[in-house]
Curated annotation (Swiss-Prot):
Annotated Gene Ontology cellular component terms: cytosol
Keywords: Cytoplasm, Gluconeogenesis, Glycolysis, Isomerase
Superkingdom of the source species: Eukaryota
Subcellular location: Cytoplasm
Gene3D superfamilies named among the record's database cross-references: 1.10.1390.10, Glucose-6-phosphate isomerase like protein, domain 1 (3.40.50.10490)
Official protein name in the record: Glucose-6-phosphate isomerase, cytosolic 2
EC number: 5.3.1.9
Active site, renumbered: 360, 391, 516
Catalytic activity: alpha-D-glucose 6-phosphate = beta-D-fructose 6-phosphate
Gene (name only): PGIC2
Pathways per UniProt: Carbohydrate degradation; glycolysis; D-glyceraldehyde 3-phosphate and glycerone phosphate from D-glucose: step 2/4
GO molecular function: carbohydrate derivative binding; glucose-6-phosphate isomerase activity; monosaccharide binding
Keyword ATP-binding: no
Organism: Clarkia concinna (Red ribbons)
InterPro entries named among the record's database cross-references: G6P_Isomerase, G6P_Isomerase_C, Phosphoglucose_isomerase_CS, SIS_dom_sf, SIS_PGI_1, SIS_PGI_2
Amino acid sequence: MATPSLISETEAWKDLKAHLEGIKRTHLRELMGDTERCQSMMVEFDNIFLDYSRQQASPDTINKLFKLADAAHLKRKIDRMYNGDHINSTENRSVLHVALRAPRNSAICSDGKNVVPDVWSVLDKIKDFSERVRNGSWVGATGKELKDVIAVGIGGSFLGPLFVHTALQTDPEASKNAIGRELRFLANVDPIDAAKNISGLNPETTLVVVVSKTFTTAETMLNARTLREWISSALGASAVAKHMVAVSTNLPLVEKFGIDPNNAFAFWDWVGGRYSVCSAVGVLPLSLQYGFAVVEKFLQGAHSIDQHFSSAPFEKNIPVLLGLLSVWNVSFLGYPARAILPYSQALEKLAPHIQQVSMESNGKGVSVDGLPLPFESGEIDFGEPGTNGQHSFYQLIHQGRVIPCDFIGVVKSQQPVYLKGEVVNNHDELMSNFFAQPDALAYGKTPEQLKKENVSEHLIPHKTFNGNRPSLSILLPTLDAYRIGQLLAVYEHRVAVQGFVWGINSFDQWGVELGKSLATQVRKQLHASRVKGEAVEEGFNFSTKTLLTRYLEASSDVPADPSTLLPKI
């Protein structure tokens, strides 16, 4: 009998569908009353503690999800990724971001070649270069030390490094290394972003890192040319070679741009942009800011989860459990969104990064074989640090739509504060909410409880909380570079598990391309209208033509052949 090509055709999927109605009839109040069940839904690895007992699931549900994983050949797919097989089938590429954080003596192959020596060659180059910049032996064109760095990139070249940078900013070791230095990220092609990035900086002390694998990414290269002009107008064209470096594989274009190809740092086709933070894309700017030793600890943390993911049995495997629970929530319970709620301000950029990792990876409508998916897949990811989110969108989560939540807490704060006379310290106040919110979502508040509190009859419907809203809690011991690396890898592999089970390619992103190609047509029209005064042609639909015409007429003061005008705040 042939193996079903869609996971939804398997007996394991059908078994879960049949199991669903019983779970829907069981409230979390009842499920949480079973201590043995709760204990079975707690897993620990390297002092990372996962509690998923507040999921709408019984032990039987979890066992059925493991059978679904077997039906999807999850273990084999994980092994294929680590073995360098071309699991990105539409682009015929390996998917080996795990190699980026592998120890020097490891062997991970792509197309029969061990790629780890190449990875470490680049890491050694980054270490040498970043140390020379940081100790002042590499200086700018006027002899001044380069204290400020602007990393220019977009998408995965921006969101991942920004997440790690923000998480490290208040870590004692990292922040000590960053004294007197500044790291900024320029992503948006909107000139306002360029203006904000150069505001207050001196070109003489600024190093620009241009991140583009092909060195042709439209937004990134326009921003790079803008900063090149900013540097050369102040210091002369020859200064560019001392103030700009590249993360790219296209050395001819790097050199043509004015950057010494010796100052280009490579990465590879087997690294997807959203999985590239552990490559030169993230390691170079982060090492310039915090020193390579700190960033190496981040890589070691990610590697520890890589090992756990590839070797731990599914019932103790944190990324596997998280991925399977997401499949259950999305495809069976019908919850399309997920809230990522870190109770740490240092993790404020985690949700935007995971939003890209998850939604760009699993926002697909067809299987690896090109078959339309007859079930819901992919998640809408969003989030905000606690307790800020409690005063923003938690209202909807408590009494509106059901949105499964990831609560992430840290035992020891990066920045402890104690005030005499307070009932608890600042971090304990934060964590009081971390522990309370999952129970509030799970248990809710019944009309009977409100009546016992003598709540007015007309207010009871408004103050009733139905509860039965799923969440999980992840508790980290600290939030240093090592733990940040672990957290990143947990979420990366969780996304892969979802894709492997759904049977989709989580490693391409064709949805990004269509808008790019249509923008090319618009760009040509804007040029023709600005320079030649041509009316908007018939190649656009009525709506777009109307909007374009209105835009051009309202911005007719834009010069046809402008002199260079740089942003200024």
